[in-house]
Amino acid sequence: MVTAVTPHSGTVNRQYKSSIFAMLFSERKELLKLYNAVNGTSYTDPELLTVNTLENAIYMAVKNDVSFLIGTRLYLYEHQSTWNPNLPLRNLFYVSDLYSAITEERNLYSSKRIQIPTPHFLVFYNGEEKHPDQVVMKLSELYESAEETPELELIVHVLNINQGHNEALLNACRPLREYAAYTAKVRENIKAGYPVREAVEQAVTGCIREGILEEFLRRNRSEAMKVSIYEYDAEKHLRMEREEAREDGYRNGQADG
């Protein structure tokens, strides 16, 4: 097992969580279930995982919900409720900070080779835009000049966890399946016209009653509600920014025409 080093740019996130996904899967027992479901493995010892999520990387531009080490591999898991084609670039910034932390005590100018854990990038998407079960995003797709063999590449696998998508994965991981069900309930309540706070409270109460994330929501009810409201507000802010950008683009196009 690789031991994580506390990052110089932030400590491991043990307190504030920016999302329900981060709250749920920062618990190693639940995170191991998700890892097993994604990779088709059957590990049973949560001690195999070393969580090394950066505490201060929670601002909108560069954040990651959970990063962890297992063996000599580094995994970065994130949920997204809005579609974002810039995920490879964001992950590049984030993993650079992680590698800086992991190698902080080592001499990068040494003649001895410094080995680093192999990275894997995975995003769980549960937004309202329609997308297939899996999408592969590449950093090279963002380059202004396309090259057949780019010298720097980063690949992000985006998995759709909305109803009707990736059912085998959801069936293999109860926490992920119930997380998707909870977020769907919040969204349904908001669409029905409830104020955000009431929509979240009804979703929490309903899920506890129906046995969806029951233990987690009973134990973390107050914090889960606050985080869910924060998540919705952040998602709404991003949607408004995108709509304004589209309107500006349309107006500029009209002016140019």
Regions found by a protein language model. Give the residues of each.
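Elongated, amphipathic alpha-helical interaction scaffolds
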Residues: 1-256
